[in-house]
Structure formats: structure tokens, C-alpha cells
């Protein structure tokens, strides 16, 4: 999908910072800035590298100051807000256009001199390539000077003082290093060293309103200058009257050597190296679209966006899924919810298997990891649903894997893990996760929040859901049924019979205890006692009881639930986490950490449940083909959301009352994954005219 922006999109610096872009390297690293080339968040960097994939991430190249010289005049092309607004760099005044088709490019103009800028990350490596090209009329003396701003610090740090960057030449390239990180630079420009200058007072306008520290900085250690357009050195000139400046950054010396060999084969033309890397990334993204098999342009964009969240995990020598950029790492619950859309829906079968193996390795007392903290080794297990969703992900993988792709040893190990999860949950495990005598699953106590509505602010739980949450018990029934079917396939008759009996018990209790008088579902039941006020709140969690492969809900009741969701929770970009008619409804997400936490699951719109809603509409429709067409029409309206905020991505959340502006992570895995999955169901239903 192509995105074109022009001068009307950056009438002011603040307007220009409303749109951003995201590039990823498949290691957890990324490149992200606004479309005017500014850092509007502390997490914006040109090169955020993963020293250990995917969660030991360092801000290596923060941004670049860009000055175009025309004769004796100088024009600053980059834009950046500063704490003292009079210092703001307003290069957007010279920016004519921005184009993004998976990779960003800019066109600037000053005094008739045109500057184009392109950049790309290199998938699978911590590398960044940037190219500037100047076009000037004959006889016009123009050149560009760039001043990189480096971080060399952990992604979330805001150093007031920095460790000195050591710089030296190594095989005709610049080698920069600190105790923790090192970086190579190849360039066809002239590097001019300068005394290290620390920049502390960038203003990050998109952090301030969210209650985050809205400032940060970096340091400058050199300038890089291009050739002049009037020079006669043909090696630094391409096309008619144009000059190139290329910067190739990398953290792996072997990778840099490969690029040097490529450069030497093209008569030391670093532009050819850049073009190779640029085209390589374009082709990679195109292949993802083709492999997805999706038809509509919107769905094909979602496929690329979903694949962007796939990442390597070094600790298991395998794959995982980044929950959201720029804030989150790979989380258990998010990974399992996004699993289908980020792997199976785009034909990434090997990645799917590897992700399951990654989490199997960390399973403890029947619980899958909830969180791998940024830059730390310990794993957090405070989740009840990740394990149940793992079993669902395993089932979906086994339904998709071909006989040729089948790995009997993996399947046997995975089924053993799934069986152990059921066993631990039955007898009870950590965090008060246990099966009650009625067969239903209860979890949580004290300050531990174990469902996706897990916010905790100090000792305050804005959405306490201790007891028996509705979606957890839908997942529980589904997981028991899946393990039953897998054991049946293995000929385990006794175990199969026991799980069959258990599934019937769960279903009977669920329908009796969770069904409200009007046919909709209670959100959560107290562990011991009758439904309370929290039970009766209308939340989006009941939608997940309709979309599991094994569901307890019949069509008649499903239609009642869908009607309530449509009436009180539905928006075109997601479902509200709480009915807008509830006295506790928060119409806006923003402000201090406390204000944001209190609103997070109290009406804020979440994109990912929308996929489940659309799939349920098709599944329980009397006319699935017609319903699927209507769903496709609604999904195509996501073009507007894809063009807002981070281009080509769907955000984590939106305001509850008027969901016009994205909030939270600007690129969320389960958002794009679940909407892509809804596309798959809808396109299939249109073709075959049946329920999914």
C-alpha cells in the first residue's frame, strides 16, 4: 500500500509529527521517526539495535541533522522540537513530499536544488543504510552536510552523562565503540571529526501528553560532507548534475565486509550497495504479500504489518512475536493471540513451529511466560490465559501443517506440554490458578492481575477480575476439547474419555452460571458467590466465547451477544473495553500514568477484539456469504486507520468516545494479526458461501 503526504500534512511542526513510519529488522530492532524526520518520542530512533534479540535494545543512531549548502547559504532540512521552542529545527518548510511504500523517501527543495533522501534497515541484521541525492542546475554549487546524533545507550535510558565513544579507522571504515556496543560506518562522504557535543534537550511532544518524560538527547562526534555539485570527480557524481552521499551503518563486521566486497565489484560505488539493500527489502516485503494469498490491498498491507512483528529470540535460538512497537517486547499472551495472523495467515509455518517451541521451553508448572522484560534475563509468569491460548495455537498449527511439514517428535512433545497444562490447571498452580468443583477455572488473588485486563497502579486494580473470567473459561473449555482430540488421535482412550467428561461438565456449568437472563454473558464470576456488579458490566470479553474452535455457545445465544456488542461496544477501529453506558466508562485515554491506567480497560477502544467480532458475525450468520461481504466492506474502511499515526500499522488502542486518534503502541501485533485473520475468514466465506 502506498502512502503519499505533502505540504498540507506539515503546516506546522506539530502537524508534521502526527504521522510516523516503522521499519523492522526481525531481531526486535527498528527504525522509526515522524514523516518530517523528527523524533517525537524518546523511542524514535533511526537505528534501535537488538544486541541480544529481541529485548536487549540500544538506541544507536538517534537522528541526523541535515544541512543543505547552496553557494554561501545554508538550509537545515531536518526537523526537531527542542525544550526551548525557539530552538526548533523547522526543515519541514523545505520538504515537498514524503512517500512510503514499506520504505520511506523524502524530497526537499531549496533555491532550486532538490534533495532526495531514502533509507532502509537490513532484515536479519542491526544495519541501517541512508542515501542522499542532490540535483542542481549546471554551475550551481551545492553540497550536503550531515551530523549524526548517536545514543549508544539502552533504549529506555535517558543519560544525563554519556560514556565517551571511541573512534578509529578500521580497514578504511569508521569504527565506533563503548563498553557495551560498537558500530561501523561506511560512507562515500568526507568525515570530519568534531569535539563530542552532548544534546540533552530534544522535546518529545508525543511523550508529554502520555505522562512520559518528554525530553531526551544524544551526542555528536563528527560531520559527514558530500561532494560539491560543481566538482569534476566523476566517481562522486551520478546521473546528470547530481551528487550522492551514502551512509551504511552496521554492527556486524562480517556483514560490513560483505558490503565492502559488493562495493569493490561495482568500482567502489557505494550507491550500488545502497540500491541492492533497498531493493532487497522491497522484494522481501513483496514476497510476504504474495505468500499471504490475500486479495485486497488493505489485507496485503496487514500481511506485511503482521510479519513485521516476527522476531528472533536468541535465548532459544528460535522465533517469537513482538507485542508492540515501540514499547513492548515478546509477551506470552500477545504472542498466542497474534500467532495465527502473524504466522499461519501469511504462510510462515517454520516461524509458527519455532514460536511454539520457544514458549514450550519456558513453560513452568503449566504456565507459559507472560513477559520477557526489556534488557533483563528473568521471565514473568503472571498470566492465566497464555497457556490456554498456546494449546489453541498448537491446534491451529496442526490443522495447517502438511504431511510433508509434519514433525512427529515435535508434535508428541507439544501434546505432552498441552496435557501437562491441563493437569496443572486442574490440580492448581501458581497465582491461585485452579479448577473449581464445578469444572470452571478460577485465577488471581491479591494484587495479581492474570487476564489481559491486567493494569495495576500501586495497590489499585482498576479492573479486578479475580475469580472466573468469561473468556478464560471459554479458553479452558476449548483447551480441554483440543487435548481430548489430540489424545484421541494417539489412541489414548482412557484419557480421552476423562477429558470428554470434563468438557461436558465445564460446558454445563458455564452455560448455567455465565448466562444472564437476557442471554448475554457475565464478564467475571466471583470465585465463591453470586454475580456482583463487576460481573454485570458489559465488556468485550464475551466475544471470545464465540470464536474458539470449540465453543459452548449456540447460534441463537450468539446472535444475542453479537447484538449487545454491536450496540454498546462496536466502533470501526475496535471494540470498547467497557460499555459507553457504564458509569465507570472513560471516554479518553491520556494524561498521567494514573489517569491512563484508570482508562486503559475502562472504555478505551482496543483494535484486536474487532477481528473476533467480525469472525463471529460470519460464523453465526444465517447468510454467511452476504455477511462476509459486509465484513469485507467494513475491513476495507481500515485504510483510514492505516494512514493515521504509524503508516501501514494498526495501533494498540483508541479513545473510547471518539476513536479518531491512535494511542499506546503505534504498531500492535495482535491488532494487525486479528484483523488479517478476519479478512481470511471473510474472503473464504465469500468464495465458499459457508460459515467458518
Segments predicted by a language model, with ranges:
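Acidic, mature catalytic/reactive cores of soluble proteins
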Residues: 1-692
Amino acid at each position: 500500500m502506498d502512502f503519499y503526504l505533502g505540504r498540507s500534512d506539515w503546516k506546522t511542526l506539530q502537524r508534521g509529527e502526527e504521522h510516523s513510519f516503522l521499519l523492522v529488522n526481525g531481531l526486535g530492532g527498528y527504525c522509526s521517526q515522524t514523516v518530517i524526520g523528527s523524533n517525537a518520542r524518546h523511542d524514535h530512533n533511526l537505528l534501535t539495535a537488538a544486541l541480544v534479540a529481541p529485548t536487549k535494545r540500544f538506541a544507536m543512531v538517534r537522528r541526523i541533522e541535515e544541512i543543505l549548502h547552496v553557494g554561501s547559504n545554508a538550509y537545515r532540512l531536518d526537523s526537531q522540537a527542542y525544550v526551548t521552542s525557539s530552538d526548533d529545527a523547522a526543515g519541514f518548510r523545505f520538504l515537498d513530499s514524503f512517500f512510503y511504500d514499506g520504505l520511506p523517501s523524502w524530497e526537499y527543495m531549496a533555491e532550486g536544488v532538490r534533495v532526495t533522501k531514502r533509507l532502509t534497515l537490513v532484515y536479519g541484521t542491526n544495519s541501517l543504510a541512508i542515501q542522499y541525492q542532490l540535483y542542481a542546475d549546471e554551475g550551481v554549487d551545492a553540497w550536503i552536510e550531515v551530523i549524526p546524533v548517536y545514543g549508544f545507550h539502552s533504549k529506555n535510558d535517558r543519560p544525563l552523562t554519556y560514556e565517551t565513544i571511541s573512534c578509529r579507522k578500521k580497514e578504511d571504515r569508521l569504527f565506533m565503540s563503548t563498553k557495551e556496543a560498537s558500530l561501523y560506518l561506511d560512507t562515500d562522504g568526507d568525515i570530519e571529526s568534531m569535539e563530542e557535543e552532548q544534546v540533552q534537550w530534544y522535546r518529545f511532544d508525543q511523550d508529554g501528553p502520555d505522562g512520559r518524560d518528554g525530553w531526551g538527547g544524544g551526542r555528536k562526534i563528527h560531520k559527514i560532507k558530500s561532494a560539491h555539485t560543481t566538482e569534476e570527480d566523476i566517481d562522486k557524481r551520478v546521473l546528470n548534475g547530481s551528487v550522492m552521499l551514502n551512509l551504511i551503518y552496521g554492527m556486524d563486521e562480517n556483514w560490513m565486509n560483505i558490503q565492502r566486497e559488493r562495493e569493490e565489484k561495482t568500482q567502489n560505488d557505494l550507491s550500488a550497495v545502497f540500491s541492492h539493500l533497498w531493493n532487497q527489502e522491497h522484494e522481501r516485503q513483496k514476497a510476504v504479500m504474495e505468500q499471504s494469498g490475500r486479495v485486497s490491498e488493505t489485507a496485503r498491507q496487514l500481511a506485511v504489518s503482521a510479519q513485521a512483528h516476527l522476531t528472533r529470540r536468541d535465548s532459544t535460538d528460535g522465533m517469537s512475536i513482538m507485542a508492540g512497537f515501540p514499547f513492548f517486547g515478546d509477551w506470552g499472551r500477545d504472542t498466542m493471540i497474534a500467532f495465527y495472523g502473524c504466522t499461519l495467515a501469511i504462510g510462515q509455518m517454520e516461524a509458527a513451529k519455532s514460536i511454539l517451541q520457544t514458549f514450550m521451553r519456558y513453560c513452568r508448572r503449566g504456565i507459559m511466560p507472560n513477559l520477557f522484560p526489556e534488557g533483563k534475563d528473568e521471565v514473568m509468569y503472571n498470566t492465566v490465559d497464555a497457556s490456554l491460548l498456546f494449546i489453541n495455537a498448537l491446534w491451529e498449527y496442526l490443522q495447517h501443517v502438511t504431511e510433508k511439514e509434519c514433525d512427529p517428535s515435535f508434535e508428541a512433545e507439544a501434546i505432552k506440554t498441552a496435557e501437562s497444562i491441563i493437569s496443572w490447571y486442574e490440580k492448581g498452580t501458581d497465582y491461585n490458578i485452579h479448577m473449581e468443583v464445578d469444572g470452571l477455572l478460577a485465577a488471581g488473588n491479591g494484587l495479581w492481575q492474570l487476564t489481559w485486563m491486567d493494569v495495576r497502579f500501586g495497590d489499585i486494580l482498576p479492573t479486578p477480575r479475580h475469580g472466573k473470567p468469561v473468556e478464560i473459561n471459554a479458553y479452558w473449555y476449548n483447551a480441554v476439547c483440543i487435548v481430548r482430540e489430540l489424545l484421541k488421535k494417539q489412541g489414548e482412550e482412557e484419557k480421552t474419555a476423562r477429558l470428554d467428561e470434563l468438557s461436558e461438565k465445564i460446558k454445563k456449568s458455564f452455560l448455567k452460571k455465565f448466562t444472564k437472563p437476557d442471554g448475554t454473558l457475565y464478564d467475571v464470576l466471583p470465585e465463591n458467590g453470586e454475580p456482583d456488579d463487576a460481573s454485570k458490566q458489559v465488556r468485550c470479553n464475551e466475544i471470545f466465547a464465540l470464536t474458539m474452535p470449540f465453543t459452548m455457545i449456540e447460534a441463537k445465544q450468539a446472535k444475542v451477544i453479537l447484538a449487545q456488542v454491536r450496540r454498546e461496544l462496536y466502533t470501526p477501529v475496535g471494540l470498547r473495553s467497557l460499555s459507553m453506558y457504564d458509569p465507570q466508562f472513560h471516554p479518553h485515554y491520556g494524561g498521567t500514568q494514573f489517569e491512563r491506567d484508570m482508562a486503559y480497560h475502562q472504555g478505551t477502544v482496543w483494535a484486536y477484539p474487532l477481528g473476533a467480532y467480525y469472525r463471529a458475525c460470519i460464523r453465526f450468520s444465517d447468510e454467511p456469504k452476504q455477511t462476509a461481504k459486509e465484513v469485507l466492506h467494513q475491513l476495507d474502511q481500515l485504510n483510514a486507520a492505516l494512514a493515521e499515526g504509524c503508516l501501514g500499522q494498526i495501533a494498540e488502542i483508541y479513545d473510547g468516545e471518539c476513536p479518531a486518534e491512535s494511542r499506546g503502541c503505534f504498531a500492535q501485533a495482535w491488532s494487525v494479526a486479528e484483523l488479517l485473520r478476519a479478512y481470511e475468514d471473510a474472503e473464504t466465506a465469500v468464495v465458499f458461501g459457508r460459515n467458518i
